[in-house]
């Protein structure tokens, strides 16, 4: 502080001093202002035609401009040491012309020691350092003598300690000067206030980084970092800790709905556990489901997007088939005894548990049908049938079991015989050739289920090596004196994936996917029409809705949809598609109702998802318009293929039906006295008929070949457009 106060007296505006730039360059600058509070000066200089300036601490000024300190007077001492008195006397003697001889060597050494001590003080002030000189202090004690005149007769008494002090002081001065000259600025230079603030901020950032790193280390110890998504697992666990869970129980009341939409979550299977997948589905209450969708920000920061869905019932992974049946299909059994039509669907991704829910527990390819909704509904049907109020009706129980594959019907209880769907004059849909089997107990029903399930068509997809690629419909029909009293249709729908998700994307697979998605779209529209009491129900859009037409019309019709979902993180996209489909069927949402524009957008998204990726023309880009036109061509080709296939089958049947005529002609020739004229006439007539059918069959086959080529071309174009660049 003494140095600062002394230096302040030397600093004033306009003074030229030396400064050091941040790049190490030292040049001259003029003092502009002197700030006593901050102990700094503001300087300015001209550079490149412009005036620049900066602030410099007093210590930096002293370090770069030591000459300012050298000009300062020394502080007066009350008791001057011996060497200072000698120096003063020496100067006085030199100031007058005296004939006294020159001083001896002892006085010269004293003079040298005095200059050394003075330089040491100045150097210490220049460097703003406290220099401890224990040797000097001791030497002072050694040579402190009473102020008596020094006699030449005893020079050795003071000469020895003075020489020792002189040598020690010179060594300390040289060491201090050496260190100061080696690093004249950095050793004593203090930083400006701005630099100090920046360093404080930097230190805080480093401390925060260290704390975050320590927290990450602790979290990494709590979670197995070998998991590919352990960070998402931690975030999901922390989010679930904030939830209050009230799951569905068997004691909860059963609410009756005309359209009941439920969702069921299955547990992680062995394959998902082997891949160390995490569960991204939470069910905190009996009607609420949360999807923790993993996301990445632009800077690759991981976060969760929690999406909520509301349904009539939500079943977690601990719910058994009995619990699911109690709240879904069981209330519908009463409906068919009251003369109504009931339908229960299982909808979802391949491998999400549809067949397990409807058909029973699976062990490999073997299935325990007694644990499925099929068998449970059958048991309740026979229980109600034997009650006194319904026993007097004389009801009989029949069952049918068929599948819809690629738009064609096959009877699973009659060796997969092909069926035809026709509409009679009363606009009633009839399934020609479908056999109804009379059953007398639930055990008979289970046998029928086992027999039909063994014949069901399956295929391989990315999610399931034995995936059901057809819609299976098990119907329980009540008849009173041959007349239908009620019907309960239990449908296990095919997987809702697109054809591009299968292992082998050949034409057959594409046709499967297109037909499945088309029927699912038609089914959703029919259910929504039923819920909104619309006058028109679009049941003719697919074979599935045609067969179930009577379930969508009439006031005494009830429907239940069970949406099954997979909880793994790899199935998150398909799970969201399933939940959105089910949510739009019921039109239940935790948010406010959508506006008209949002409904149009929703319909457009549904058409895209359910038409094997078709795009609806509208506000689309050029590439999207091209893809939309190609998708439209693909759908037209698929529809044309199905129509031509039906025509080809009809022409072939007509040709086969002419077979007996040729056999009759052959038998005629076996007779010894057959009429040749009659033979020729019949042969010409048969040839004319056959030529007509063969010509028609040839035209149909040509058109079918062309349609297949168009479908192949459209499929390749769509694949090339969808392939990432």
From Swiss-Prot:
GO terms for molecular function: ATP binding; ATP hydrolysis activity; centromeric DNA binding; microtubule binding; microtubule motor activity; microtubule plus-end binding. Keywords: Acetylation, ATP-binding, Cell cycle, Cell division, Centromere, Chromosome, Chromosome partition, Coiled coil, Cytoplasm, Cytoskeleton, Kinetochore, Microtubule, Mitosis, Nucleotide-binding, Nucleus, Phosphoprotein, Ubl conjugation. Belongs to the TRAFAC class myosin-kinesin ATPase superfamily. Kinesin family. MCAK/KIF2 subfamily. Residues 2-254 are annotated as: Globular. In complex with KIF18B, constitutes the major microtubule plus-end depolymerizing activity in mitotic cells. Regulates the turnover of microtubules at the kinetochore and functions in chromosome segregation during mitosis. Plays a role in chromosome congression and is required for the lateral to end-on conversion of the chromosome-microtubule attachment. ATP binds at residues 264, 348-355. Expressed at high levels in thymus and testis, at low levels in small intestine, the mucosal lining of colon, and placenta, and at very low levels in spleen and ovary; expression is not detected in prostate, peripheral blood Leukocytes, heart, brain, lung, liver, skeletal muscle, kidney or pancreas. Isoform 2 is testis-specific. This is Kinesin-like protein KIF2C. The modification Phosphoserine is found at residues 6, 22, 95, 106, 109, 111, 115, 166, 175, 187, 192, 519, 621, 633. A motif (Nuclear localization signal) lies at residues 415-418. Transmembrane segments: none annotated. The gene is KIF2C. Residues 258-588 form the Kinesin motor domain. Signal peptide: none annotated. The microtubule tip localization signal (MtLS) motif; mediates interaction with MAPRE1 and targeting to the growing microtubule plus ends. Residues 89-116 are annotated as: Disordered. Changing residue 111 to E: Alters interaction with MAPRE1 and association with microtubule growing ends. InterPro entries: KIF2A-like_N, Kinesin-like_fam, Kinesin_motor_CS, Kinesin_motor_dom, Kinesin_motor_dom_sf, P-loop_NTPase. GO terms for cellular component: centrosome; chromosome, centromeric region; cytoplasm; cytosol; glutamatergic synapse; kinesin complex; kinetochore; membrane. A motif (Microtubule tip localization signal) lies at residues 98-101. PANTHER family: KINESIN-LIKE PROTEIN KIF2C, KINESIN-RELATED PROTEIN 6. The modification N-acetylalanine is found at residue 2. Phosphorylation by AURKB, regulates association with centromeres and kinetochores and the microtubule depolymerization activity. Ubiquitinated.
């Amino acid at each position: 502080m003494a140095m600062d106060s002394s230096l302040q007296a030397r600093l004033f505006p306009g003074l030229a001093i030396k400064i050091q730039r941040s790049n190490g360059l030292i040049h001259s600058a003029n003092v502009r202002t002197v700030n006593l509070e901050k102990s700094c000066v503001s300087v300015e200089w001209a550079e490149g035609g412009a005036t620049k300036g900066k602030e410099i601490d007093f210590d930096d000024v002293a370090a770069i401009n030591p000459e300012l300190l050298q000009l300062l007077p020394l502080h007066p001492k009350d008791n001057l040491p011996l060497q200072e008195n000698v120096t003063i006397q020496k100067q006085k003697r030199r100031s007058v012309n005296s004939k006294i001889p020159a001083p001896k060597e002892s006085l010269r050494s004293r003079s040298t020691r005095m200059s050394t001590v003075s330089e040491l003080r100045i150097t210490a002030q220049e460097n703003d350092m406290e220099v401890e000189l224990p040797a000097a202090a001791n030497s002072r004690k050694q040579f402190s003598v009473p102020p008596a005149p020094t006699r030449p007769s005893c020079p050795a008494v003071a000469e020895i300690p003075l020489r020792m002090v002189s040598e020690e002081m010179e060594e300390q001065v040289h060491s201090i000067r050496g260190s100061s000259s080696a690093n004249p600025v950095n050793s004593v230079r203090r930083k400006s206030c701005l630099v100090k603030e920046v360093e404080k901020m930097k230190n805080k950032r480093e401390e925060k980084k260290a704390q975050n790193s320590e927290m990450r280390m602790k979290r990494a110890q709590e979670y197995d970092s070998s998991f590919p998504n352990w960070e998402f697992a931690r975030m999901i666990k922390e989010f679930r800790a904030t939830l209050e869970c009230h799951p569905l129980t068997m004691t909860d009341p059963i609410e009756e709905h005309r359209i009941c939409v439920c969702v069921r979550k299955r547990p992680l299977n062995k394959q998902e556990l082997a891949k160390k997948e995490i569960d991204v589905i939470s069910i905190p209450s009996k009607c609420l489901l949360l999807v923790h969708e993993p996301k990445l920000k632009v800077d690759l920061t991981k976060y969760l997007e929690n999406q909520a869905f509301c349904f009539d019932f939500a079943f977690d992974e601990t719910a058994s088939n009995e619990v699911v049946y109690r709240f879904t299909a069981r209330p519908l059994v009463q409906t068919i005894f009251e003369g109504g039509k009931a339908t229960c669907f299982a909808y979802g991704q391949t491998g999400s548990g549809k067949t397990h829910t409807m058909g029973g527990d699976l062990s490999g390819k073997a299935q325990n049908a007694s644990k499925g909704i099929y068998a449970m509904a059958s048991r309740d049907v026979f229980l109600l049938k034997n009650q006194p109020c319904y026993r007097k009706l004389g009801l009989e129980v029949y069952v049918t079991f068929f599948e819809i594959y690629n738009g064609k019907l096959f009877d699973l209880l009659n060796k997969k015989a092909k069926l035809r769907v026709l509409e009679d004059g009363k606009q009633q849909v009839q399934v020609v050739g479908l056999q109804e089997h009379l059953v007398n107990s639930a055990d008979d029903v289970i046998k029928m289920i086992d027999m039909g399930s063994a014949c069901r068509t399956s295929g391989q997809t990315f999610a399931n090596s034995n995936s059901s690629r057809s819609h299976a419909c098990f119907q329980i029909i009540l008849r009173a004196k041959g007349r239908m009293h009620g019907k309960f249709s239990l449908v296990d729908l095919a997987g809702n994936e697109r054809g591009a998700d299968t292992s082998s994307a050949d034409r057959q697979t594409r046709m499967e996917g297109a037909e499945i998605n088309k029927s699912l779209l038609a089914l959703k529209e029919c259910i929504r029409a039923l819920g909104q009491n619309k006058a028109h129900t679009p049941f003719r859009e697919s074979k599935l809705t045609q067969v179930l037409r009577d379930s969508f019309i009439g006031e005494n019709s009830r429907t239940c949809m069970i949406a099954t979902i997979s909880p793994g993180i790899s199935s998150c996209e398909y799970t969201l598609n399933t939940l959105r489909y089910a949510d739009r069927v019921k039109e239940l949402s935790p948010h406010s109702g959508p506006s008209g524009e949002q409904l149009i957008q929703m319909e457009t998204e549904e058409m895209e998802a359910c038409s094997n990726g078709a795009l609806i023309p509208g506000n689309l880009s050029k590439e999207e318009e091209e893809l939309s036109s190609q998708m439209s061509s693909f759908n037209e080709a698929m529809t044309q293929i199905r129509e031509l296939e039906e025509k080809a089958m009809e022409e072939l049947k007509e040709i086969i039906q002419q077979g007996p005529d040729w056999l009759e002609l052959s038998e005629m020739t076996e007779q010894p006295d057959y009429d040749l004229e009659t033979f020729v006439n019949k042969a010409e007539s048969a040839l004319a008929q056959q030529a007509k059918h063969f010509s028609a069959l040839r035209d149909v086959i040509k058109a079918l070949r062309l349609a297949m080529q168009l479908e192949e071309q459209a499929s390749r174009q769509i694949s090339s457009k969808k392939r990432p660049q």
